[in-house]
Amino acid sequence: MRNNSTLIFVLGSLLAFVGPVSCGQAASEQKASYGTRVKYQAGQKIEFPDFTVEYVGERRKTMPVYPRGFLYYDFKVIKGNSEKVISWTTGTGIIDPTDFEFDGKSYYLELRRSHKLGKLNDNEFVIWQGRFGSK
């Protein structure tokens, strides 16, 4: 009886440790579809049908003609050995999507506001297939 109690205790402890670890790993990756709101955070990988997206972070770039600078939000698009960084900014205040090409296909990324879905939360983006304005 004592051996069974020890075995149950060891297995229970192992499950208590492995369960949250595996759930945490699953939470760091999510699947998404084109044309849907997607929540993002730094370091999280989001799997779309044609590629994976990872939010890298934000950066400010200043220029002599605009010393205040522009705030850029950078996303890394990955598929196999191919990788590309997509940068979105409001620039001087125009909130438009960023067109990009990856693996021979056209897409666009929306932040802050989607032309079809409306206002987006600070931690949401939308990726559409095709070029913005061509639909």
Question: How should these model regions be labeled?
Answer:
Residues 10-19:
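Bacterial N-terminal signal peptides
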Residues 1-10:
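Bacterial N-terminal signal peptides that target proteins for export
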Residues 1, 18-23:
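Generic low-polarity alpha-helical segments
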Residues 23-135:
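Surface-exposed, beta-sheet-biased, low-hydrophobicity segments with strongly acidic/polar composition
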